[in-house]
């Protein structure tokens, strides 16, 4: 289960760094397969320490700052995705491990090695992988549903939870290994993957997020690109220039399919068609295509005739139950992924119509007196809020602010100017958002609480508008998390409805 390096080792010593959900899963997996364990966490008493003991895992636990001393006798380092490789106490440890030839793997690499080992017994599932700054969970959940509707046994895991190795252990124990794995993967998880080769994978978008963890946008984008193996079908968002830099080289045998909110121009690509006031999900087809194989590389000076493209209408966008153009793009990505592994189209289109979306992701929670109240509390970065504004495409009173995580808020200016009636600012970094939007001419007011901001937004909104909570920030300056922030917003909207004699 641990690759060629450990094939002849009976009980290799593994150092697990970090005892979060993935760290605990890695510890359980390694213990299950007879490894000796040392578990280290910067916290003296991490919350999962009792769980480690409850599972009867014989591991030496070390709490406190990391140091290279932890490597004594270690043959493999298993690092949790929450730990930045740039952390001051982690850099010398990782450097020492590499100098000593000790592999540094994350949970995704352990999962990849396990699938390879199971493959020796004939297990050959399809693997679909999803990453991106925003839209991962929606696209992952939707892709899993589509696979089910096509009659496949599916396991959905990864960043979406449960942990990859926990889901794999459960499948092995129940002798119910799935036909298809659908994995939501963060840049953190991809950073320490080395042999991961999914059948199809998508990068939905790349915008500013977790830059402190990676050290910069280029490193963050490079981590996202690790989702593709040499033979992986690459599903790419053609509307995102950073994503398109991940397109395969011209001489590569890798297949690429694109999607976007624009009309597709190339055979096999997906997009949106606007016709007579309706928006359609479509796929481009070359009318002149033959069944003969087309060479990947063109000869020098070869004249290529532009394809004669027709657009096949798949379904109206308003047949989707998830709101916004960005969610239409997520639906196209999910459809493209499932088609890329050979699933039939008809049941997939039925599945697209069925999916209701995920909580706190551009979720309509009420319409009161003609005003929509939309919960996008999961919009914790600028890219998510830009997508929500452009996706809803209606007049909006925006509620934004919180812990900005060092982001540049300038990209908010254009969509705010286009769509917003006003902006209600909350949280620690409200002044930074105000500074970024000061030249838009849009009215902005500061509020001490989310409740106050929601009521002020209601007073300004007109019928046909939306009051949108999409903070572009993390929540921890004011709330326990984004779900707590959403609960406060919903509670306030419920109070407003009750005051107006309406139930939601």
UniProtKB/Swiss-Prot annotation:
One annotated GO biological process: cell wall organization
Gene3D superfamilies assigned: Mur ligase, C-terminal domain (3.90.190.20), Mur-like, catalytic domain (3.40.1190.10), NAD(P)-binding Rossmann-like Domain (3.40.50.720)
One GO cellular component term: cytoplasm
Main location: cytoplasm
SS bond list: none
EC number: 6.3.2.9
One Pfam family matching this protein: Mur_ligase_M
Molecular functions per Gene Ontology: ATP binding; UDP-N-acetylmuramoylalanine-D-glutamate ligase activity
Keyword annotations: ATP-binding, Cell cycle, Cell division, Cell shape, Cell wall biogenesis/degradation, Cytoplasm, Ligase, Nucleotide-binding, Peptidoglycan synthesis
Pathway(s) this gene product operates in, as recorded in its UniProt entry: Cell wall biogenesis; peptidoglycan biosynthesis
Protein location: Cytoplasm
Sequence positions that bind ATP: 132-138
Keyword Transferase attached: no
Reactions it catalyzes: UDP-N-acetyl-alpha-D-muramoyl-L-alanine + D-glutamate + ATP = UDP-N-acetyl-alpha-D-muramoyl-L-alanyl-D-glutamate + ADP + phosphate + H(+)
Protein family membership: Belongs to the MurCDEF family.
Functional description taken from the UniProt entry: Cell wall formation. Catalyzes the addition of glutamate to the nucleotide precursor UDP-N-acetylmuramoyl-L-alanine (UMA).
Protein name according to UniProt: UDP-N-acetylmuramoylalanine--D-glutamate ligase
